[in-house]
Amino acid sequence: MKVLDESKLRDYVEQFNIDDEELYSNISNEETFNFLQKNIPLFECPDVDFERTYYFRWWTYRKHIKKTKDGYVITEFLPDVPWSGKHNTISCPAAHHYYEGRWLHNAEYLDDYSYFWLRKGGEPRLYSFWIADAFYNRYLVTLDSNPLLDLLPDLIENYNLWETGWDWKGYHIGQRKNGLFYTIDDRDGGELSIGGHGFRPTLNSFMYGDAMAISRIANLARKQDIENEYRSKASKIKNLVQDKLWDSESKFFKVLPKEGGALKDARELHGYAPWYFNMPDSGYEEAWKELM
């Protein structure tokens, strides 16, 4: 039984279509109402701005669902951009694609996208990408563990490659001897940040999130040795982030530019990244006073 009717969805789609100059067409404006009607949860609330934003995000999201010879992918930009990978994909925003797209009723779109990243020419390490965490949190909505379990070896391989690391324009991205992960801000989706290159709260939070996700996927697969191994990895990262990246004076997570150095003297929004993965213990919440 439907609780909400589709009249609001139709009204919003018609408004958005009128205001749009349609230059790129994967799922056309003409097809959008039928597509969203079949694929998204309907939503209604007293705040019209919030409601309009909800439907606008879905109206926009479908523009980026792209059919390719490797199945469906989700793009960040509609026009091709030179810093993208195969099929104009970019790993930097990909986890957000899963967190939003997990509510799509047709699982084919993100199933294809998952296999693309790990087996069909995607470049999941071109930018920071909490891929295992994104896959697992999608599973919590779909409850279909088949692609998750099938891709577990690939997720482990991806994590191992982050640990080994690689050289990028004179820098070594990956895990260092101190146990933390190093990256440059551009590869972390934070180019021109004040904190700059180093052991950043972002990437280290992402690796914590991925380690926890792999542990949970291994639990579904009944592979206790892998479950324990990755839970231990997550615990070590958590302790290091709290010990090395927390500024006890300004009460904030910051960038550590180099091993043995001092933390950067800047509070940036990415200092809240650890809470995205529910990582910090109690006692660190004073950082949130900056937003109160």
Language-model features and meaning:
Residues Q15-L152, I156, K254, E259, ...:
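Substrate-binding groove/exosite segments of carbohydrate-active enzymes
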Residues V3-Y24, Y115, G121-F129, E163-S232, ...:
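The feature captures the catalytic groove of carbohydrate-active enzymes
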Residues K2-V3, R52:
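Eukaryotic PEST-like, Ser/Thr/Pro-rich intrinsically disordered regions enriched for SP/TP/PP repeats
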Residues I65-D70, H105, T164-L180, D243-S250, ...:
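Proline-centered turn/helix-capping motifs that create local helix->coil transitions or kinks
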Residues Y54, W58-Y61, L155, E227-L245:
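Short amphipathic alpha-helical coiled-coil/interface segments
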